[in-house]
């Protein structure tokens, strides 16, 4: 199932969802019509599986990405002269003063539980043979893929919310919360059971879908964070999954760091293990991160058919962009910085509070509350083709082989085994091609403290350093940030390294250990009396 076919199935499914949501049909009657009397054919087998992925497309940038990156220390969205306050919704994420009514948190809950429901429905149709299968083997492979995808959705949910409802059937009963550790056990068990049945093909027909190596990478991530979830570390279990992926010979690093983020050619990538495919022309939309981060004048630089959102919102925190080592090409491969020109090489100019001045993106932010239209480096990680609309057709990778190598490195460090430096060096090599010797890092160096300058910033200066305790394996934390910033890892990494609720950065100060999880959305609590609010959020 190539990307074009896969996105076609997703677009058809999204259209169907839109039609259903606009009806006023009784749920029982509708279920009876579709599942008991609708004449499914063999042609419905592929779309049934593809449709379960739809929650990823429309639920990423505005919900998952914001809750994972804007809550961390690398990216911030201060207000500016063109707007971007929006009632303080972005600042609440940065300041960690969110509540149960914040829209991004509610949408995160809704989108990923929608994914669970889509998986349960698709599994139900296959298990009951309501949809014909090409063969017994393909039926089992399809069921394995859907169960793995459901496990992925559940991982994201219990990672973000802690105790959550665990539902695996099409029951209409209101569910109670299941303890986080039990949902963790379910996810581990599901993935362990289905991985042997997942397709081994890397890319090609499995592009955008969970194959065996993506399944193992998901399980490795769950094990990597097991101590956070259950109190018991599972480093060796994570190490085992990483070794399986590495030893398979199916996966590898791409020659260039930017290769995973190109608009074309990623389908054959050995590095991208799991991705969200987008296709604007087919209605599979939702990749608008560039629209949010870019200044409106950049339309002339990238020849877009849509105008980016005013002066742009998300931008790099100075404290993070200052950590890059000299010669690391990932700095320019990740961030748009310095003077900007249009597609013909003519200078661009400010149009808001710096109207008429040369458009030059500087790295300095005065604080996390307000910036001028030019302050802060902008998003430059993905290729955005000329002619792109408000959503581009470049895919968003969720899991890359480079993370497998860095997960293994972390497990080796945390179990006092040698070899972490060699793995991290392998990832760094493509970022230091001009000076290969600078790519080399040792095990001992990875055990050093982070180079991040923590503390509250006012008028461009750190005025309150806050907690300055050394970070265990802090250099490895830096390496992960340099490699994965903008990709939705920051919140989870900061929690695992013990700094999410301890450190200060930009205008953020610690707000309590309960911020390790989000509150259950108030609308969900109001709708289901069996749901209890997470501790410290109840009032």
Predicted features and spans:
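TPR/Sel1-like alpha-solenoid repeat signature
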Residues: 216-222
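Extracellular/periplasmic catalytic domains that process cell-envelope and extracellular macromolecules
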Residues: 265-268, 469, 485
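Bacterial N-terminal signal peptides that target proteins for export
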Residues: 2-10
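Aromatic-anchored glycine-rich loop motif in surface-exposed flexible loops
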Residues: 23-47, 54-210, 223-228, 381-397, ...
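Elongated scaffold/linker segments in the mid-to-C-terminal portions of large proteins
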Residues: 43, 49, 53, 58-62, ...
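C-terminal motif of bacterial Sec signal peptides marking the signal peptidase cleavage site
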Residues: 18-21
């Amino acid at each position: 199932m190539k990307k074009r076919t896969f996105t076609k199935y997703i677009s058809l499914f999204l259209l169907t969802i839109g039609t259903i949501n606009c009806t006023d049909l009784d749920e029982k009657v509708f279920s009876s019509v579709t599942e008991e009397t609708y004449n499914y054919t063999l042609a419905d087998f592929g779309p049934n599986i593809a449709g379960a992925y739809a929650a990823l497309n429309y639920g990423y940038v505005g919900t998952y990405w914001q809750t994972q990156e804007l809550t961390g220390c690398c990216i911030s969205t201060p207000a500016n002269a063109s707007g971007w306050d929006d009632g303080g919704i972005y600042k609440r994420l940065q300041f960690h003063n969110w509540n149960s009514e914040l829209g991004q948190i509610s949408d995160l809950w809704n989108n990923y539980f929608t994914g669970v429901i889509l998986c349960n429905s698709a599994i139900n149709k296959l298990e009951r043979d309501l949809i014909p299968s090409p063969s017994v083997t393909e039926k089992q492979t399809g069921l394995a893929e859907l169960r793995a995808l459901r496990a992925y959705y559940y991982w994201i949910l219990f990672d973000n919310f802690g105790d959550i409802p665990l539902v695996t059937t099409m029951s209409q009963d209101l569910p109670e919360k299941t303890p986080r550790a039990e949902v963790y056990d379910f996810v581990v068990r599901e993935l362990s059971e289905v991985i042997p049945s997942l397709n081994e093909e890397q890319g090609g027909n499995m592009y955008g879908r969970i194959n065996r190596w993506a399944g193992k990478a998901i399980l490795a991530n769950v094990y990597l964070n097991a101590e956070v979830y259950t109190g018991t570390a599972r480093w060796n279990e994570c190490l085992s999954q990483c070794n399986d992926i590495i030893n398979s010979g199916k996966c590898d690093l791409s020659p260039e760091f930017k290769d995973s983020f190109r608009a074309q050619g990623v389908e054959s990538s050995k590095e991208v293990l799991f991705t969200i495919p987008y296709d604007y022309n087919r209605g599979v939309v939702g990749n608008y991160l560039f629209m949010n981060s870019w200044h409106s004048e950049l339309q002339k630089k990238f020849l877009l058919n849509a105008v980016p959102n005013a002066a742009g919102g998300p931008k790099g925190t100075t404290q993070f962009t200052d950590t890059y080592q000299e010669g690391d090409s990932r700095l320019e491969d990740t961030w748009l910085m310095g003077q900007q020109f249009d597609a013909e090489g003519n200078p661009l100019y400010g149009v808001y509070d710096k109207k008429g001045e040369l458009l030059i993106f500087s790295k300095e932010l005065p604080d996390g509350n307000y910036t001028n239209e030019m302050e802060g480096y902008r998003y430059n990680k993905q290729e955005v083709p000329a002619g792109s609309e408000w959503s581009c057709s470049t895919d968003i990778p969720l899991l890359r082989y480079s993370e497998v190598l860095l997960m293994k490195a972390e497990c080796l460090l945390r179990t006092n085994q040698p070899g972490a430096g060699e793995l991290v060096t392998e990832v760094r090599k493509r970022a230091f091609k001009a000076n290969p010797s600078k790519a080399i890092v040792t095990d001992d160096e990875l055990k050093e403290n982070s180079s991040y300058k923590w503390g509250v910033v006012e008028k461009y200066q750190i005025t309150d350093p806050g907690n300055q305790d050394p970070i265990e394996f802090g250099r490895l934390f830096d390496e992960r940030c340099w490699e994965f910033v903008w990709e939705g890892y920051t919140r989870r990494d900061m929690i695992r390294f013990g700094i999410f609720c301890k450190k200060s950065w930009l205008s953020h100060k610690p707000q309590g250990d309960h911020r390790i999880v989000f509150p259950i959305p108030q609308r969900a609590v109001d709708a289901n009396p069996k749901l209890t609010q997470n501790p410290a959020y109840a009032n």
